[in-house]
Amino acid sequence: MVDSTIRLVATIFLISLTQQIEVCNKAQQQGPYTLVDYQEKPLNISRIQIKVVKTSVATKGLNFHIGYRAVWRGYCYNGGSLDKNTGCYNDLIPKSPTESELRTWSKSQKCCTGPDAVDAWGSDARICWAEWKMELCHTAKELKKYSNNNHFAYHTCNLSWRCGLKSTHIEVRLQASGGLVSMVAVMPNGTLIPIEGTRPTYWTEDSFAYLYDPAGTEKKTESTFLWCFKEHIRPTTELSGAVYDTHYLGGTYDKNPQFNYYCRDNGYYFELPANRLVCLPTSCYKREGAIVNTMHPNTWKVSEKLHSASQFDVNNVVHSLVYETEGLRLALSQLDHRFATLSRLFNRLTQSLAKIDDRLLGTLLGQDVSSKFISPTKFMLSPCLSTPEGDSNCHNHSIYRDGRWVHNSDPTQCFSLSKSQPVDLYSFKELWLPQLLDVNVKGVVADEEGWSFVAQSKQALIDTMTYTKNGGKGTSLEDVLGYPSGWINGKLQGLLLNGAISWVVVIGVVLVGVCLMRRVF
């Protein structure tokens, strides 16, 4: 009897304990459900170091000398209005300095011209056709445009010279030609002048002469590494309104994949296609393989009227943005890949553990449900009462043991869970983070000091040629122009006044004479 009573009490206690712990309604199952893996967006991009052969050029000091010289010649003949030969032959003759003259000018910082001639007539007019000796030196000189023709039946010659000199520093550029790297000077109009690395380079343009001295120029070639972003370019095709990746279309594999490389070297950003020689203004980069010349950018011939910043500056800024964008895409792609990896790993672990702990999925979903797997990946969910969770493994008379809440009668088995040691299951590399960097800008060639001097000299000539002086030494016009301001006006007014008084006197004398004659006769 006692044994029966004990069994009954134990049974009631177990039933009561089971009702406290088993709080899920298995009769209200819903499903089936399947855990979904996160699908990452395919992006084949990586950050790598590329070994290249770098050719660079550095310049220092005064390495560029600009000189100009020209003469205004006006040769006239005055045969009267009926002579068809009357008139002037005017022209501006460029007389750019020779290489030896420009060297001498650069040392003395003076330019030399022939003699001026103003209103040289008769036999003196032969100076217009003489061999001029460049013996008159000036710091700078601007011409005066004379066109005198004031001597009847004689020829008249007018000569006026202009000259100038500028010694400055310019940057030479690099250009790829036939797989080789050469130095060039870029004119404001985009013309490329080959520069010798061992001897001075001299060339002329109209009345201007240029001399580049390579003494302060250093050109070197070295092997170096560039940090680049490598992106696989997969061709796509459109079929029936849908876009497909032809990399794997029809089960075929792209045996010759194409890649884009976006690289950075100090403050320069550029695209480095595979197997190509790419030239920036002061550096060229070459990879192994077949060489295809690429000027980057391919437009040095830029008019100074179209751009306040050169096209290279704009391209450099654009490629710096591309470089940083590629870095950001790489970082986001890495994060996306990590999320996908974590998603798959988490789902596998969750499926495995949820088959042991039927409350695991409910905890992850934030719902009070229990799970029951009916296949390796599909499961049913049943609603449950909420289970408290705190900073201890015990709650009231229950203890969490082996993945279940069970009855606990030994308080010594309880302990605090407020502190725990972290365990890193993943080995991720450090993310590359984009940052703001200085971008090197060069400006247009026309804004460089030497070329601005050329532009100013040409503008000064235009201003001078706008005005013509028809007068000279020994002419009546020179006498008139030599009077002070207001003198002619005063003389004219005095002439008019004196003329009026004279007429009054004459008329008075005539009247007096008439009266006297009447009395006599």
Swiss-Prot record:
Q: Which Pfam families match?
A: Baculo_gp64
Mind listing the UniProt keywords for this protein, alphabetically?
A: Disulfide bond, Glycoprotein, Membrane, Signal, Transmembrane, Transmembrane helix, Virion
- Record's subcellular location: Virion membrane
Record's keyword annotation contains Membrane:
yes
**Leader sequence segment:** 1-20
- Where do the TM regions start and end? 501-517
- Where primarily located? virion
The record's GO CC annotations read: membrane; viral envelope; virion membrane
The protein's recorded glycosylation sites are 44, 158, 189, 396
The organism's superkingdom is given as: Viruses
The record describes the protein's role as: Attaches the virus to host cellular receptor and later induces fusion of virion with host membrane.
The entry describes its oligomerization and partners as:
Homooligomer; disulfide-linked (possibly homodimer).
Name this polypeptide is given: Envelope glycoprotein
In its UniProt entry, the species of origin is given as: Dhori virus (strain Indian/1313/61)
